[in-house]
C-alpha cells in the first residue's frame, strides 16, 4: 500500500478500523467460548496522547501512517470508549495458568491486557491487536491492571528492534501515554502499548485446561491452534503430537537466535512462551553488554534461573511442561482402549519429540555462530572455535555486540588490523591466541576479506536496544519529549547498517549504565 493517504483519509479510517475490530472472524480465539476468556471493557485512561507509533506496523495492518495524528487514535488505543466503537463490541482477557520461576503458579491470565479484535494484514494473515495496560481484569490478582510508561516504551522499541534483527516476535503498533499516576516502587505514569501478533496463545493456556482436568477444552484449544496456525499438523498421524513437535522446534530455533545476538528475555515462565515460537512479553529483558555467560538481566531473578546461559535449558524445560499438558490428547488416534497403555505410549512419543530440542537447537546455534564468524565452509572444529571466543569474551567481559561486529575487520594475513576488536579485551594475549586460531581457520575459506566482512555485517548488528539507550528515551518521554523514542526506533530499524550520524548509539555503554536495573515491576 502507499503511504500517500491524507489526514482526512485517516480520519475516515478510524471508524472503519473500530468496526473491523468489533467483528470477530470465523475461527478467531474469541469465538472459542466463555471458558477461554472474559469479555469486559477497558478502564478509561485520562487524557491519552501518542508517545510512539510504528508506521511499518500500520502498513502491515493496512492503515495509513497519518492515522496516528487523529485525535481519536489515542482514545481508541488507550481503550477508551469512542463514538466509533461498535455498540456490540467487547474486548476480552484470556485465562491461562503456568509455571513461574519453575514453580506451579496456578491460574494466571491476562491481568492487564485486553485483545480488542483482529485485522487482516497486507500479507493476508489475521492479526490480533492487544492493549497492554488497559486496566484490571478478573485475572489481575493483586495488580492494578496498568502498565507504566517506562516498560511500555521498552516493549514498543524492543518488539520492533527484534523484528528488524530477523527474530520472530510480537510487534507493536503504538504506545499511548497518560499523566494518570500509578504506584510501583515510586509514583509513575500510565501507558498502554498495542501489541500485534497472529496469536497470543501461550504454553500456559494448555497448562490451564490440563490442570483443571478439562480434556474437552484442551482439545478445542489445540484444534484451534492447529487449524489456524499449524494446518500441516492436521495431516500427521497424530496431530497433537505433531503440534508438540512443531512448537518445540520453533522454540529451539527462537532461543538459538536469542543466544546469537546476546538477548536475554528475563522471565521465561511458561505463561510467557508463545505456542507460535515468537518472542512475547517484553519485561525485564536486556541485550548483553560486557559479556558474562551468567548474565542476569532481571533484578528479580535472584537465583539466576533465566540467566543468558540458562535460556536453552529453560526453553527445553518449558517444552516439557507443554508436553505434559498435551498428554491427554496424544495418541487418541491410535485406538488404544486401555487408558494406561495409551498414556504410557503418549509419554514415550512425547519424550521422543522432546529429545529433538537439543538436536535442533545445537545445529541452529552453530549455523548462526558460523555466519557470525564469516565461515562459509563447515568444519567440525567450528563449534570449538566459537566457544573459545565466548570463553575469551567472558574472561575479559568484552562487549558482545561490538566484538562480533568488529571481527569483520580482522584480516586473513594482517594482524595489525585486529586492533579495533582487540581493544575490547582486557586479556590481549588471550585474544591474540584466539585470533591466530581464527586466522588459520579463515585461510581455509575462499572468500576474500572484503566479501567476508560484508557477509558478517549482514548478521552481526551494530545497533541493539541497550538498556541505557532505552533509559535516555524514557527520561525524555517523561518530560513530554518523544523525539528520542522516534529517533531510537528509526535507528533500530536498520541494525546492520552503518549509520555515521548515529555512531554514538553503537558505542560502549557509559559508566552510569552499570547502575541500571530492570525487574518484573512494570
UniProtKB/Swiss-Prot annotation:
UniProt family annotation: Belongs to the SELO family.
Which EC number(s) are documented for this chain?
Answer: 2.7.7.-, 2.7.7.108
- What general EC class does the enzyme of this chain belong to? transferase
UniProt xrefs under PANTHER family: PROTEIN ADENYLYLTRANSFERASE SELO, MITOCHONDRIAL
**Binding residue positions for ATP:** 109, 111-112, 132, 144-145, 195, 202, 281
Q: What Pfam families does the entry give?
A: SelO
Catalytic residues as annotated in Swiss-Prot or TrEMBL: 271 (proton acceptor)
Which gene produces this protein?
Answer: ydiU
> Could you tell me what this protein is called?
Protein nucleotidyltransferase YdiU
- Quote the catalytic activity from the record: L-seryl-[protein] + ATP = 3-O-(5'-adenylyl)-L-seryl-[protein] + diphosphate; L-threonyl-[protein] + ATP = 3-O-(5'-adenylyl)-L-threonyl-[protein] + diphosphate; L-tyrosyl-[protein] + ATP = O-(5'-adenylyl)-L-tyrosyl-[protein] + diphosphate; L-histidyl-[protein] + UTP = N(tele)-(5'-uridylyl)-L-histidyl-[protein] + diphosphate
Any one GO molecular function term: AMPylase activity
Query: Where along the chain is Mg(2+) bound?
Result: 272, 281
Q: What does this protein do?
A: Nucleotidyltransferase involved in the post-translational modification of proteins. It can catalyze the addition of adenosine monophosphate (AMP) or uridine monophosphate (UMP) to a protein, resulting in modifications known as AMPylation and UMPylation.
Q: Which UniProt keywords apply?
A: ATP-binding, Magnesium, Manganese, Metal-binding, Nucleotide-binding, Nucleotidyltransferase, Transferase
InterPro entries listed in its UniProt record? SelO
Write down the required cofactor(s).
Mg(2+); Mn(2+)
Amino acid at each position: 500500500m502507499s503511504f500517500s493517504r491524507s489526514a482526512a483519509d485517516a480520519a475516515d479510517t478510524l471508524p472503519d478500523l473500530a468496526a473491523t475490530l468489533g467483528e470477530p472472524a470465523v475461527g478467531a480465539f474469541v469465538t472459542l467460548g466463555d471458558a477461554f476468556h472474559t469479555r469486559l471493557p477497558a478502564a478509561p485512561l485520562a487524557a491519552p496522547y501518542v508517545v510512539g507509533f510504528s508506521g511499518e506496523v500500520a502498513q502491515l495492518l493496512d492503515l495509513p501512517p497519518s492515522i496516528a495524528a487523529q485525535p481519536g487514535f489515542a482514545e481508541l488505543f488507550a481503550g477508551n470508549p469512542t463514538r466509533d466503537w461498535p455498540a456490540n463490541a467487547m474486548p476480552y482477557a484470556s485465562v491461562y495458568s503456568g509455571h513461574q520461576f519453575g514453580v506451579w503458579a496456578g491460574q494466571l491470565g491476562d491481568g492487564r491486557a485486553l485483545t480488542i479484535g483482529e485485522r487482516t494484514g497486507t500479507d493476508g494473515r489475521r492479526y490480533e491487536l492487544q492493549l497492554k495496560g488497559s486496566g484490571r481484569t478478573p485475572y489481575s490478582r493483586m495488580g492494578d491492571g496498568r502498565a507504566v510508561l517506562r516498560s511500555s516504551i521498552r516493549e514498543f522499541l524492543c518488539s520492533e528492534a527484534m523484528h528488524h534483527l530477523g527474530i520472530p516476535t510480537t510487534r507493536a503498533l503504538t504506545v499511548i501515554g497518560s499523566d494518570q499516576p500509578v504506584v510501583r516502587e515510586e509514583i509513575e505514569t500510565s501507558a498502554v502499548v498495542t501489541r500485534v501478533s497472529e496469536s497470543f496463545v501461550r504454553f500456559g493456556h494448555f497448562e490451564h485446561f490440563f490442570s483443571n482436568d478439562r480434556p474437552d477444552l484442551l482439545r478445542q484449544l489445540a484444534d484451534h491452534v492447529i487449524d489456524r496456525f499449524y494446518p500441516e499438523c492436521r495431516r500427521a498421524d497424530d496431530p497433537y503430537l505433531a503440534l508438540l513437535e512443531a512448537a518445540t522446534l520453533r522454540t529451539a530455533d527462537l532461543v538459538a537466535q536469542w543466544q546469537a545476538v546476546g538477548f536475554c528475555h528475563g522471565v521465561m515462565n511458561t505463561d510467557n512462551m508463545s505456542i507460535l515460537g515468537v518472542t512475547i512479553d517484553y519485561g525485564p529483558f536486556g541485550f548483553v553488554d560486557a559479556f558474562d555467560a551468567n548474565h542476569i538481566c532481571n533484578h528479580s531473578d535472584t537465583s539466576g534461573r533465566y540467566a543468558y546461559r540458562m535460556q536453552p535449558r529453560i526453553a527445553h524445560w518449558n517444552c516439557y511442561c507443554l508436553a505434559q499438558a498435551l498428554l491427554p490428547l496424544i495418541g487418541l488416534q491410535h485406538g488404544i482402549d486401555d487408558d494406561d497403555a495409551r498414556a504410557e505410549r503418549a509419554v514415550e512419543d512425547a519424550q521422543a519429540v522432546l529429545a529433538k530440542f537439543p538436536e535442533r537447537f545445537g545445529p541452529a546455534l552453530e549455523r548462526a555462530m558460523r555466519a557470525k564468524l564469516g565461515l562459509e565452509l563447515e568444519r567440525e572444529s567450528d563449534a570449538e572455535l566459537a566457544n573459545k571466543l565466548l570463553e575469551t569474551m567472558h574472561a575479559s567481559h568484552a562487549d558482545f555486540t561490538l566484538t562480533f561486529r568488529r571481527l569483520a575487520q580482522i584480516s586473513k594475513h594482517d594482524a595489525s588490523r585486529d586492533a579495533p576488536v582487540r581493544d575490547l579485551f582486557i586479556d590481549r594475549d588471550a585474544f591474540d591466541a584466539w585470533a591466530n586460531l581464527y586466522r588459520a581457520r579463515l585461510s581455509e575459506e575462499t572468500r576474500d576479506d572484503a566479501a567476508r566482512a560484508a557477509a558478517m555485517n549482514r548478521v552481526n548488528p551494530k545497533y541493539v536496544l541497550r538498556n541505557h539507550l532505552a533509559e535516555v528515551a524514557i527520561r525524555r518521554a517523561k518530560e513530554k519529549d518523544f523525539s528520542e523514542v522516534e529517533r531510537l526506533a528509526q535507528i533500530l530499524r536498520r541494525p546492520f547498517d552503518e549509520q555515521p550520524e548515529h555512531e554514538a548509539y553503537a558505542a560502549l555503554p557509559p559508566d552510569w549504565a552499570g547502575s541500571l536495573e530492570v525487574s518484573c515491576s512494570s
